């Protein structure tokens, strides 16, 4: 053969599936040199495939808003989670981006406890998670939030930042099946029912964040094709 394309594609898919822990789809290009009888393979894109076996039968828009804790019309992720009872969220009263480095440290400390206990949580806060510019978001690294199963960017009226849509952690999100929600409730784009969180007793509370636990597991449903995700309480 002039160019072993089948073998190259096989290796790319094997390595991609191993790293992302699910089947992948790729885009590629090849240039061939007929005189030298060789060529160059260019990998343009590689991304995880939506698992059709996890297709959601129901229409998530039919779930009543009054029962919803979080709703995003612009999200990343696909599937159903029914085993998470904990939420860590950034307090919004008096929030200012100047405190973002401290908030990152407080979250890192709580995350360690979840790792020690082998548990997971939902993480909610304003701005771009993982931004290197702390004025645009909370500057956490992936190890600081690695026990989170859903990460939410919740915009505020007085703190409006273009969403990152998970770009800072894209490989980790896809590899570990973590959901990423973008919500701007002040623009009527999605739902963030923080009042429900505020009324629950805190398992742990710091100056800037709260950790609350629900009596029953929360239900997370993510439709990757429609980019629609919901999180609501068990009946």
PLM regions and their residue ranges:
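Conserved metal-phosphate-binding beta-hairpin within the catalytic cores
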Residues: 22-48
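C-terminal active-site "lid" helix and adjoining low-complexity regulatory extension at the edge
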Residues: 3, 48-120, 125-126, 145-147, ...
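A glycine-rich phosphate-binding loop feature that marks nucleotide/adenosyl-phosphate handling sites
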Residues: 28-37, 120-136
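Phosphate/diphosphate-binding loops
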Residues: 23, 53, 58, 153-180
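Short acidic, glycine/serine/threonine-rich loops at helix termini
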Residues: 35-43, 55-58, 133-138
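Conserved small/polar residues in nucleotide/adenosyl-binding loops
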Residues: 232-235
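Acidic, Ser/Thr-rich peripheral helices and adjacent loops at domain boundaries
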Residues: 141-151
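A long amphipathic alpha-helix within ATP-dependent nucleotide-binding catalytic cores
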Residues: 1-25, 29
């Amino acid at each position: 053969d002039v160019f072993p394309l089948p073998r190259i594609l096989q290796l790319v898919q094997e390595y991609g599936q191993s790293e992302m822990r699910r089947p992948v789809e790729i885009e590629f290009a090849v240039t061939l040199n007929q005189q030298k009888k060789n060529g160059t393979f260019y990998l343009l894109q590689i991304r995880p495939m939506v698992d059709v076996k996890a297709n959601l039968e129901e229409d998530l828009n039919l779930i009543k808003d009054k029962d919803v804790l979080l709703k995003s019309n612009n999200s990343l992720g696909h599937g159903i989670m029914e085993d998470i009872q904990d939420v860590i969220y950034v307090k919004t009263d008096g929030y200012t981006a100047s405190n973002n480095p401290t908030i990152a440290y407080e979250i890192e400390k709580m995350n360690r406890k979840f790792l020690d206990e082998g548990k997971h949580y939902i993480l909610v806060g304003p701005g771009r998670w993982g931004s290197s510019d702390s004025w645009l978001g909370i500057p956490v690294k992936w190890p600081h939030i690695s026990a989170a199963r859903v990460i939410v960017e919740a915009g505020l009226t007085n703190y409006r930042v273009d969403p990152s849509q998970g770009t800072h952690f894209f490989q980790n999100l896809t590899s570990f099946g973590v959901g990423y929600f973008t919500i701007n409730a002040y623009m009527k784009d999605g739902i963030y029912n923080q009042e429900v969180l505020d009324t629950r007793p805190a398992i742990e509370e710091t100056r800037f964040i709260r950790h609350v636990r629900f009596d029953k597991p929360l239900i997370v449903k993510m439709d990757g094709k429609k980019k629609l995700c919901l999180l609501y309480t068990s009946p």
